[in-house]
Regions:
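Iron-sulfur cluster-binding electron-transfer modules in prokaryotic oxidoreductases
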Residues: 1-264
């Protein structure tokens, strides 16, 4: 999926939209994402009044409620800086659906379109805007990937994680048999249709584990929560990790090295 990338020199400042699920269930992934950006020389700005992007209400058919939530976000990013989001689902909501929510209000639609053009999913920003080049500082490991439906079908960022992982010599990425299938989370779908969601999550967990990987990676907190929850119910030790945390750890983030595999 083609989109306009920032022209001119590398951005020096970005906004960070954490997402509800990262904030509440895997805050370490948010911190690791911020550290990945800061290590590249980026100043990260975190608007403290940010809330939900409105996606659960929107996909449940509550357009008015989603519009109210989205409207509250429009004024949080006044500078013309990129907005980096560690979730394909939330990034997809902000980029593709915010302008639709305000289609009948020219002023708000213009603000939504301006914001939408600046929204980047984390791996997209690292790869396509910052053009990061990393060295691996971890032990050999095998992983498999789960990409969210929004990353694949809305954002077109489903291959970016693979490209980033390909820079890491000690990481082997194994292909799963249900690569393009949903994990069953789907915002409120997992609550409204728990039996169907549970069956989908079970199939996905099976496909990921059957690869023989040491762990699975995903760039979406909802998918991680759903699949890891299924594995937890089974008392299975196989687990998933957010892509941001894995990249931070593998490129020396927790070992006192810079991103080039050298002592800082």
């Amino acid at each position: 999926m083609q989109r306009n990338l920032p022209a001119g020199p590398r951005p020096k400042d970005v906004y960070f939209f954490a997402t509800c699920l990262v904030d509440l269930f895997c805050p370490e992934a948010g911190m690791d994402a911020i550290q990945l950006l800061e290590r590249e020389g980026i100043t990260v700005h975190f608007p403290e009044n940010q809330t939900c992007c409105g996606q659960p209400a929107y996909t449940s058919g509550y357009a008015d409620e989603a519009r109210a939530v989205a409207k509250a976000q429009l004024d949080l990013f006044p500078e013309n800086w990129p907005v980096v989001v560690p979730s394909g689902s939330c990034a997809g909501m902000m980029r593709h659906h915010y302008p639709k929510l305000f289609a009948e209000d020219p002023m708000l639609k213009a603000k939504a379109e301006n914001l939408a053009e600046r929204v980047f999913e984390l791996s997209e920003f690292l790869l396509k805007v910052l053009n990061v080049k990393w060295k691996d500082s971890g032990k050999p490991t095998k992983v498999t990937l789960h990409t969210s439906c929004s990353a694949r079908r809305e954002m077109g960022t489903h291959l970016h994680a693979r490209e980033l992982l390909a820079q890491l010599d000690g990481v082997e990425v194994l292909q799963q048999s249900h690569e393009s299938e949903c994990c069953g989370f789907g915002g409120t779908f997992s609550v409204r249709q728990p039996a169907i969601s549970g069956a989908m999550a079970s199939d996905k967990a099976d496909a990921l584990k059957e690869t023989g990987a040491d762990a699975f990676l995903s760039a979406d907190g909802g998918c991680l929560m759903n699949i890891n929850g299924t594995l937890e119910k089974r008392r299975d030790s196989f687990r998933g990790q957010h892509l941001a945390s894995f990249l931070w750890e593998r490129t020396g983030g927790s070992g006192g090295k810079n991103g080039k595999g050298e002592k800082a």
